[in-house]
Amino acid sequence: AENGCSAALILMSGLDSGVLATAERLARDRGLTVLGAITKPIDILTLEKLLELVPLIDRHQEVSNSGSMVDKSDFSVQELTQAVSQGQIKPWFQPRINLADMAFVGVEALARWQHPVKGMIPPDRFIPLAEESGLIDELTVSMVEQSLAEVARWQTENLTLDVSINYSALSLADLGLPDYLAGLVAARDLKADRVTVEVTESSVLTEIQNSLDVLTRLRMKGFQLSIDDFGTGFSSMQQLQNIPFTELKIDQSFVKRALSDKDAKAIVETTVDLGRRLVMSVIAEGVEDLETLELLKNYQCNQVQGYFIAKPMPGNQILEWATMWPSVASGYTG
């Protein structure tokens, strides 16, 4: 990292997978590109899958260098402010599937910034800047209003879906959020129980007192509450009992390694079991192949999302995708 290495890395070790997972996390935290980590003896098929990603990584780096994808240092707070006010940042939607019957049941709204000059800017490039500059509330309001408008439009076309919307720690400090969101849902003729507020473990910890208040009020108004990236933060089991969450989302870092890493597999299985015992729905994100889908189905995970199902897409593509999905899903059932 100190020498500015841009090569894609594959970590291998004969040590236990816990040590390897820590090394992988440290490498990523230092800005290194890590395709994956595998334990010895090496599984050839796993290694081949990782090596197949190299051309994609190289292509991404070429695109980054050409300026189509940009770092947050490449644009200003003024540009971001203008983007929010002009509607350049829009929600894209990633479908979520119910594993019991493979039905299309919901979407997660994800922010995408279509810059008029610099092209598509991913959320990890501008969300931190929005938080640092105080724009996150304005951005969140825009995302929520656009997302609910799309959900309402789909509903008029006889497609009723749940929608999950991400909220930051700063937004959770706003005691007016529950009333605002309830009014917005009512104005769109939507039901509160079809709207899920997603928060990360770290978000809850950042503003613990206000977060508990706001989350409790949201739940009392009928909204679903999801703890995102479960297993990657530092929350205790006590918090799961104290906060009225209705859903757990297993972080994709565990899901993607479930087939090759026994510890990740155990975490996935245990999380599904924990959610079931706490009467919470469990969602697995980052499903990228049929084998992982089948594993999660065997564990009785409730819902999944990931590139194997569909990549995030603009709202105007959802109706067409919904029409196409049943024929695709029929190949995975039976």
Predicted regions and their residues:
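EAL-family c-di-GMP phosphodiesterase catalytic domain
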Residues: 14-15, 33-51, 60, 169-173, ...
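Alpha4 helix (beta4-alpha4-beta5 surface) of REC/receiver domains from two-component response regulators
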Residues: 2-8, 15-36
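Charged helix-capping and loop-helix junction motifs
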Residues: 179-183, 209-214, 262-269
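His-Asp phosphorelay/catalytic-motif detector in bacterial-type signaling
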Residues: 3-10, 31-34, 137-138, 160, ...
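Bacterial c-di-GMP phosphodiesterase EAL domain
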Residues: 72-190, 202-203, 216-217, 237, ...
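Hydrophobic/aliphatic anchor position in the core parallel beta-sheet
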Residues: 9, 163, 245-248
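CheY-like receiver
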Residues: 44-52, 56-84, 330-334
